[in-house]
């Protein structure tokens, strides 16, 4: 969920007043489909209270295994000491190759291509949900990222639905697994990043069949 501008500034103000640190994991921020990517907290933080983290594993491929942290100056030494204490850095060849990929503009072009590909997959998933699941689901949080949140009609059990999907070769995360407190709504997290549009459309047909079996 993307925070509103007022909430962002309120959080930064709280961190400054209490000398607290904010850990910002900018997960999947590159993949936004309805507008320009939203700026980071770190980019509007005048008080150096945000520790900004990211990875290239999602935008490129998992095997690259290179992430990064933008650390406020007061923490530079402590972070370097901690890093050296735990493990060595990513291989120099990986780092230099990635730096060249960024510097020459190839990464920006790659992101544009990936946004287009993931937008096509997201749209295929949304069309399939609308056609095959109808009023059995409510779709939320589809503007960015590589998954959508689907709330189920009252009376449907997301654990049971996910288990039935698993038996038919599909993976879905029950939303009830994600609550810290009491479960308020049953639902599913549906990923679309690694499937072609035709496969996603077929998967929504199976989901619709499973839901209707339980209604």
Regions found by a protein language model. Give the residues of each.
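PLP-dependent class I/II
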Residues: 1-215
